[in-house]
């Protein structure tokens, strides 16, 4: 099967790449290959009672699947260049912050509305830190919480599922350059873009 774009991985980078492509170039045929499960099928067997530790599932539902490793996190999104990544080194601090705010807007539009945005800037706590020679990094943090984070991811998936072809439980085994694009190999077959 041939696609215009193939994305490997349905973590945040893959999800937002697919989101942008469907909004900016809706005619493109986009496929996303993910080694893990759809969000609705991601379940870890650890229950704290019968199963207390990792049993080494062939596909880890905590680390893999739609939403990536952060799907079941507490949904904190940092909007800062001071920590958490180095995107600003490639595109500049202003544009990096603009992109972080853009992602925040998408999250809000997909179920995150009503959540709080916290900031360390201008707080009494920051003043106390400075008085004690401690240096608190400035950041705005959107705290969605685990349940709302899941809801946001599910809503984004619902928006994308009819515009993007998702291949879940389909690890990519190899990628090779071709004369007119790339060949992507899985156990189920070969795909091109």
Task: List each language-model region with its residue ranges.
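Beta1/beta-strand and adjacent pyrophosphate-binding region of the FAD-binding site
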Residues: 1-13, 31-33
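Core beta-strand elements of the Rossmann-like FAD/NAD(P) dinucleotide-binding domain
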Residues: 1-3, 187-193
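Aromatic pocket-lining residues of Rossmann-like dinucleotide-binding sites
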Residues: 17-21
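Short beta-strand "acidic-cap" motif of Rossmann-like dinucleotide-binding folds
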Residues: 27-34, 39
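Conserved N-terminal/central alpha/beta ligand/cofactor-binding core
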Residues: 38-42, 46-163
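A general beta-strand register signal
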Residues: 71-72, 167, 185
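A conserved short coil-to-beta-strand element within the FAD-binding core of flavoproteins
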Residues: 144, 168-182
